[in-house]
Amino acid sequence: MDKIKVGLQYWIPQHGLTRLVGKLASAKAGSLTTAIIRWFIKQYNVNMDEAKHADPKHYKTFNEFFVRELKEGARPIAEGDAIITHPADACVSQFGPITNGQLIQAKGHDFSAQELLGGDAALAEEFKDGSFATLYLSPRDYHRVHMPCDGTLRQMIYVPGDLFSVNPLTAENVPNLFARNERVVCIFDTEFGPMAQVLVGATIVGSIEQVWAGTITPPRGNTVYKWDYPASGNHAVILKKGEEMGRFKLGSTVINLFAKDAIRFDESMANGQPTVMGTPYAHQQ
């Protein structure tokens, strides 16, 4: 059955299905929208007690519900300049060293930092012998993505690609998954060197948005696009630890890359471990 589930993903019209679901999720359908949201909450055991607006009737579209805001104070940010915090509510898929330019996707499957970063060899070199972590956001999770540390945006890269599911089953069976799916790469300069925060698209992920640029995808294309940002001035993008930096409609995966000897992961990190945005993730070396 697992092989069938994975195999079907090669045959379904990934982009067409994603466009359709995106349109439906953005539709204002009144009581039908409310009914779908109620079903989703029950089906995935979504904790609405922490949502700023707990009543499903508040949300005019499914997407509004999916990127729901939390109550103030629901995610306190761990203090301390040396503490790097989890960027999202998620589950640790894999983490560890970047070895020979390779990151672990799942047992028996690796992928390259250079491919993940859109084929930019010079950029990948900045993370040579560094560290990475892959975080999977499930349907029930809070789907806004935050900064794990203070950072100044240097570059944003849109990399077109497939839209396979990114759930654990697919990660274990589709080679090069995260380097073949559509993604938005954000490169930040921090006090401890460069840091990449990569938002990976997936089947029925209708859009990836950034707080400084709005919706990056759709529209979708076949060309890698790059945007460079100044370190200071009116057009600089400077974000503090814990600030929102992006969001998924619907959910997906976040991958962080850190430079060599820049960080050590927190002792709480383990594959399969649930994460809570704002809690300790790693520490500056």
From Swiss-Prot:
Key word Endoplasmic reticulum present: no
Domain of life, source organism: Bacteria
Localization: Cell membrane
Its job: Catalyzes the formation of phosphatidylethanolamine (PtdEtn) from phosphatidylserine (PtdSer).
Membrane topology category: Peripheral membrane protein
Note on how the cofactor is bound: Binds 1 pyruvoyl group covalently per subunit.
Source species: Vibrio vulnificus (strain YJ016)
Catalytic activity: a 1,2-diacyl-sn-glycero-3-phospho-L-serine + H(+) = a 1,2-diacyl-sn-glycero-3-phosphoethanolamine + CO2
Record-level GO BP terms: phosphatidylethanolamine biosynthetic process
Pathway given in the UniProt record: Phospholipid metabolism; phosphatidylethanolamine biosynthesis; phosphatidylethanolamine from CDP-diacylglycerol: step 2/2
Protein name as it appears in the record: Phosphatidylserine decarboxylase proenzyme
Active site: 89 (charge relay system), 146 (charge relay system), 252 (charge relay system), 252 (schiff-base intermediate with substrate)
